[in-house]
Design a protein with these regions (language model features):
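Bacterial N-terminal signal peptides that target proteins for export
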Residues: 1-10
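Low-complexity repeat regions of mature extracellularly deployed or surface/particle-associated proteins
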Residues: 23-235
Length: 235
């Protein structure tokens, strides 16, 4: 069974969207602007589901733009995908994918966000995570939590921000982990970028780069396993 749901909202007031789709091969497309104080909750079960269009990274057909928003996405099954843009300040997002060969690619927009948080939890093998924030502008005070359990997973995070905190936990073999954080850091009295990571498993690759105009940056990295290659650059 295949279902396609499209929400097109161009509004100035509260929007609440709740959707539960079962059976697999379901698609959800959302184009929502000026969505301050909105709540969006989507649950998909089965295989082959998608939020946004996985074939179009430039125009993924999933856009939520506003402030003080709450986003919850849950996918349970295999070969599911989430692709889109979640843009705004003081907003929270919770993403859960359970199953193998699932993909997650989310962009916080060119101008980023302020004082928000995102929690991503993935369980299964051969999963990918790509998170890009504020490619052309500076943001601040963002919290990103990522937990992945399973084998052959890939994580890529690119952020332009100050005071951004990443908490990433990977459990499994053959993991590849890359994080780049740019933008103005804190002052001598205020921490700048912070990454806390625990990677458990064999043959892991970790690459962390943190830049900024002032110090300090903080990295707490715990790697347990064999054949691990780690590269850390801080400026």
């Amino acid at each position: 069974m295949k279902k396609t749901i499209r929400f097109f909202a161009f509004i100035m007031s509260l929007l609440f969207v709740a959707s539960v789709l079962a059976g697999g091969n379901n698609s959800v497309y959302i184009d929502q602007t000026n969505a301050d104080n909105s709540t969006v909750s989507i649950t998909q079960t089965g295989s082959g589901n998608q939020v946004g269009d996985r074939t179009s990274l430039l125009q993924p057909a999933f856009l939520i733009d506003g402030n003080a928003m709450n986003l919850t996405l849950v996918q349970d099954g295999m070969n599911n995908s989430i692709v889109g843009n979640f843009i705004g300040g003081d907003s929270t997002a919770s993403i859960t994918q359970t199953g193998s060969t699932n993909s997650f690619s989310l962009t916080q927009g060119n101008f980023g966000t302020n004082a928000g948080s995102m929690t991503v939890t993935k369980t299964g093998d051969n999963n990918t995570v790509t998170f890009t924030m504020a490619s052309t502008a500076d943001t601040s005070n963002y919290l990103y939590n990522l937990t992945i359990s399973g084998n052959h997973n890939t994580v890529t995070s690119t952020m332009n921000s100050k005071y951004i905190e990443n908490n990433i936990t990977l459990t499994g073999n053959y993991n590849s982990y890359t994080t780049v954080q740019n933008g103005a850091n804190g002052t001598a009295n205020t921490p700048g970028h912070k990454i806390t990571s625990a990677i458990i498993g064999n043959s892991n690759t970790v690459s962390i780069t943190q830049n900024g105009t002032t110090t300090p940056n903080i990295i707490n990295l715990n790697v347990t396993g064999n054949n691990t290659s780690t590269t850390i650059v801080q400026h």
